[in-house]
Regions:
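Polytopic alpha-helical membrane-helix bundles and their juxtamembrane interface segments
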Residues: 1-28, 32, 39, 76-81, ...
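Core segments of alpha-helical transmembrane spans in multipass integral membrane proteins
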Residues: 34, 59-67, 129-132
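A broadly tuned "polar low-complexity/structure-edge" signature
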Residues: 37-40, 45-47, 74
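Short, flexible micro-motifs
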Residues: 39, 54-57, 69-72, 170
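Membrane-water interface of transmembrane alpha-helices
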Residues: 61-80
Length: 197
C-alpha cells in the first residue's frame, strides 16, 4: 500500500491541488490563479513521465496562463465595467465565436503534428484535442466568460478517459469529479451573473 502511495505521490498531491483549484473556480475566487500556477508546474513532470507530452506542454502553458489570469481578474476591464469593480462574469461576444473556433482548429492541428512528428505519443489525437480546447477554455476563464464551462466539460471528460488509459488513477478520478463540478459551476456562475445585473 505504501509503495503504491509513494509511486503515485505526485499524482495524489496535484489531485488535491486540483480539487482546491476547481472549488476556487466554482466560487469565482481570484485565488484559483495561485493554485493554477503551482499545480500545473508540478504536472509538467507527471504528464511527461507518463508519455502525455501534449499535456506536459499544456501544463507549461497553464503555469504561464495562471499569471495572465490573475492579472486579468485583478486589473482587467470589460465594456461598461465600473471603476474598482471586480471583473464581471459575462457571455462571450458572438463576434468571438468564429475566431475562437478557428484558433481551436489551428491549435489542434499544430499540436497533433508536433506530437506525431516529435514524440512517441500513443494518443496524439486525443492529447492534442484536449490541449487545443484547453487553450480556449483557459482564455475564456481568464476573461470570465460563462461559456468557459462548456469547453471544460468536454476537456474533462476526454482527460478522464485518457488518464485511465495512461495509468494516472488519481488524476482520472479528479477529472471525473471535474465533469460533475463543471455542470454545477456553470449554474453557480449563471446565478452570480444574474445577481450582478
Amino acid at each position: 500500500m505504501m509503495d503504491y502511495i509513494a509511486s503515485h505521490g505526485l499524482d495524489i498531491f496535484t489531485t488535491v491541488l486540483g480539487l482546491v483549484y476547481i472549488l476556487l473556480e466554482y466560487r469565482a475566487s481570484i485565488w484559483l490563479w495561485l493554485v493554477g500556477i503551482i499545480m500545473p508546474a508540478l504536472d509538467v513532470w507527471l504528464y511527461w513521465s507518463h508519455g502525455l507530452y501534449g499535456d506536459a506542454g499544456m501544463a507549461v502553458y497553464y503555469t504561464i496562463a495562471g499569471i495572465y489570469g490573475y492579472a486579468v481578474w485583478k486589473y482587467g476591464k470589460k465594456h461598461n465595467q465600473k471603476e474598482k469593480e471586480e471583473l464581471p462574469i459575462t457571455y462571450m461576444k458572438k463576434s468571438l465565436y468564429l475566431p475562437t473556433l478557428l484558433f481551436f482548429l489551428a491549435a489542434w492541428g499544430i499540436t497533433y503534428y508536433i506530437l506525431i512528428t516529435f514524440t512517441n505519443s500513443t494518443v496524439p489525437l486525443q492529447d492534442s484535442f484536449t490541449n487545443a480546447l484547453s487553450f480556449v477554455g483557459l482564455w475564456a476563464l481568464a476573461r470570465k466568460y460563462i461559456e468557459q464551462w462548456f469547453f471544460w466539460i468536454i476537456v474533462d471528460a476526454v482527460c478522464f478517459y485518457l488518464y485511465i488509459v495512461k495509468g494516472i488513477p488519481f488524476k482520472a478520478g479528479l477529472y471525473g469529479l471535474y465533469v460533475i463540478i463543471v455542470v454545477a459551476g456553470y449554474f453557480k456562475w449563471k446565478k452570480m451573473m444574474i445577481k450582478k445585473s
